[in-house]
Structure formats: structure tokens, C-alpha cells
């Protein structure tokens, strides 16, 4: 799941000339093992919540050379500690990434068959993050609610946000989106249509209030933009949000 250690791992990987392969943490361990093997991964960085995966990969993924735990304080014979590695290897990289070198492999969801590994270069991701002028000022507060193993979230929430000098707040659970909106008071959120429909219901629940108060109640006083992607958004939904 999206977290600060995840972002450190991702940027440390791609800025050192290695290839990152973000995976859906909610998949069964057997499915994850298949993707790890297909990607020819040699290092696995995982959350302690997926201890089941850490055990299975030892026998199922012979190409793996290192297992890294995000929570473990100290390394042992079987697993390296993410925190210990950070303490012992502080500094900067002497590597300058080549624009057309492989940067990230992202697996498709597999809704139309077997998931495919999409190979993205440093240039692909850099252009994804910079090709769209969204007129977003620096220090814009973005609440990141989408799965980071999807290109939409990685490119637009994280890479675009960092390139603009935004403040990126990480939502820890889809069950706490509304709570975290009130906590972080974001200016902007990227969502998919299904999530936007859920937020529309929240607006309708307090629709008896003046429009400005409706928006403040659901999104906070600083909020001004929802970006929709990943699927078709009905025009009626756009009209509803335009009222606020």
C-alpha cells in the first residue's frame, strides 16, 4: 500500500538504475509469486503484513536474492531491514539515469485475460508527469487515494505532484477517505468515477445547506479540484460537482 517507505523504495530503485515493479498488495500470494517470477525480480521489498508472501517466495521464486522488510528494525539471516539499510547507506547516487533505459514494469489488471507487464522507460514516466499543464500552483495539497501500483496514481499523484512542488498526503485506507479529507484539508484529489460517485452521495446527504457550506462540509474549505481518470465519468456527475 502507498506509504512513505514505499516512495523511498521506489525512488531509490529507479534513481540507482534499477527497475521497480509495483505490485497489488491485495493479490493472493500465489498470484504475486507468478508476477515476481515473470518480472525476473531479484529483490522483494514487502510489508510485514504480507509475511505469508515472504515465506512462499523463498521456495517459489528462485530468482530472488534479497528479501527486505519495511517494518523490521534489524536485519537477520533471512530478511534485510529497510530501516537498517537506510541508516547504513545514506548518501547520493553516482548514477545518472538514461532517458530510454527501463524504469518501471507495471502489470495490467488482467480484466481481459492474463495480466501483461508494461515496460516504461525513464522518459515515459517523466513525460507522463510533465506533458499536462494543470495550472496547479506550488505547495498545492494533494490527497493521494488511488492504488500506487497503477500508472494513473504514480504518474499524476506522485510524479506530477513532486514535479510541481506539491504537498502529497497519503490516504491510508479507502475506508477513511472522508476522515482524511477532513484531516489533511486538501486542495485537490485524483479519483476514478466509482469513487467520485461515492463522494457525490456525500454531497447529496448535506444538500439542504447553502452550496458553499455543502462543499466545506464534504471537502473542506481549501478544496477546489477533482481529477477523474481510468474510466468514463457521466456528464451528470460533472454538472453535480459544478454546482459546488
Each model region followed by its residue ranges:
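Short hydrophobic alpha-helices that are characteristic scaffold elements of the AMP-binding
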Residues: 10-16, 38, 150, 159-163
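Conserved AMP-binding/adenylate-forming
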Residues: 1-27, 145
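ANL superfamily adenylate-forming
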Residues: 49-99, 203-217
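Adenylate-forming
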Residues: 1, 46-55, 186-240
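Conserved AMP-binding A3 loop
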Residues: 103-129
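Conserved pre-ATP/AMP-binding loop-to-beta segment of ANL
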Residues: 69, 89-107, 114, 136-141
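Conserved AMP-binding/adenylation subdomain of ANL enzymes
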Residues: 126-144, 148-217, 244
Amino acid at each position: 500500500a502507498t506509504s512513505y517507505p514505499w516512495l523511498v523504495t521506489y525512488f531509490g530503485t529507479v534513481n540507482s538504475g534499477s527497475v521497480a515493479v509495483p505490485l497489488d498488495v491485495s493479490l493472493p500470494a500465489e498470484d504475486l509469486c507468478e508476477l515476481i517470477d515473470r518480472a525476473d525480480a531479484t529483490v522483494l521489498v514487502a510489508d510485514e503484513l504480507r509475511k505469508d508472501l515472504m515465506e512462499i517466495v523463498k521456495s517459489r521464486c528462485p530468482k530472488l536474492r534479497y528479501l527486505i522488510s519495511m517494518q523490521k528494525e534489524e536485519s537477520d539471516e533471512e530478511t534485510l531491514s529497510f530501516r537498517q539499510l537506510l541508516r547504513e547507506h545514506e548518501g547520493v547516487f553516482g548514477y545518472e539515469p538514461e532517458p530510454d533505459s527501463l524504469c518501471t514494469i507495471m502489470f495490467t489488471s488482467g480484466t481481459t485475460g492474463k495480466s501483461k507487464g508494461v515496460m516504461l522507460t525513464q522518459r515515459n514516466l517523466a513525460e507522463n508527469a510533465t506533458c499536462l499543464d494543470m495550472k496547479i500552483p506550488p505547495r498545492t495539497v494533494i490527497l493521494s487515494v488511488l492504488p500506487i501500483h497503477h500508472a494513473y496514481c504514480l504518474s499524476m499523484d506522485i510524479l506530477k505532484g513532486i514535479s510541481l512542488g506539491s504537498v502529497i498526503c497519503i490516504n491510508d485506507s479507502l475506508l477513511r477517505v472522508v476522515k482524511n479529507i477532513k484531516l489533511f484539508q486538501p486542495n485537490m484529489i485524483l479519483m476514478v468515477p466509482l469513487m467520485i460517485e461515492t463522494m457525490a452521495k456525500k454531497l447529496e446527504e448535506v444538500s439542504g445547506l447553502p452550496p458553499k457550506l455543502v462543499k466545506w462540509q464534504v471537502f473542506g474549505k481549501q478544496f477546489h479540484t477533482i481529477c477523474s481518470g481510468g474510466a468514463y465519468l457521466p456528464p451528470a456527475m460533472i454538472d453535480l460537482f459544478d454546482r459546488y
